[in-house]
Amino acid sequence: MKLPYLPPALFISLVLQAGPVRAATAEYEIEIRDHLFYPSELTIPSGVKVKLRVINTDETAEEFESFELNREKVIRGGKTGIVFIGPLKAGEYPFFGEFYPKTAQGKIIVVDDN
């Protein structure tokens, strides 16, 4: 089978329009309210990159921190921070608020989606 001739400019424009294929990023939200995380447990599927939107409704700053996730993010009062995590293996990944560690605690629960 013979392919039709495409002028180089047309060929290049078609290739550039196609662009790279990217996997969708799952999005979840956690709210900081009264120095607590809501929800305190968040279940996500394994093997997926996650965009975690952390909304701090308190007037004071808080830091989303997790040693297991290797993440730290200070979120000023009344602001929203974005934390990317994953892809992760099944398991539990605790996180806490560094400024109020006795109350601001939670965990990401990663489950196999099979």
Task: For every predicted segment, state its role.
Residues 24-29, 36, 76-114:
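Extracellular/periplasmic metallocenter environments
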Residues 44, 64, 112-114:
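Extracytoplasmic/periplasmic soluble domains downstream of a signal peptide or transmembrane helix
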Residues 1-5:
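Positively charged n-region of N-terminal signal peptides that target proteins for export
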Residues 40-59, 80-88, 94-96:
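Beta-strand cores of secreted/periplasmic/IMS beta-sandwich domains, seen most often
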Residues 19-23:
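Sec/Tat signal peptide C-region and signal peptidase I cleavage site
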Residues 31-35, 47, 55, 67-69, ...:
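Generic beta-structure capping elements
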Residues 57-77, 106:
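Histidine- and aromatic-enriched segments that form or immediately flank copper-ligand environments
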Residues 7-17:
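Bacterial N-terminal signal peptides
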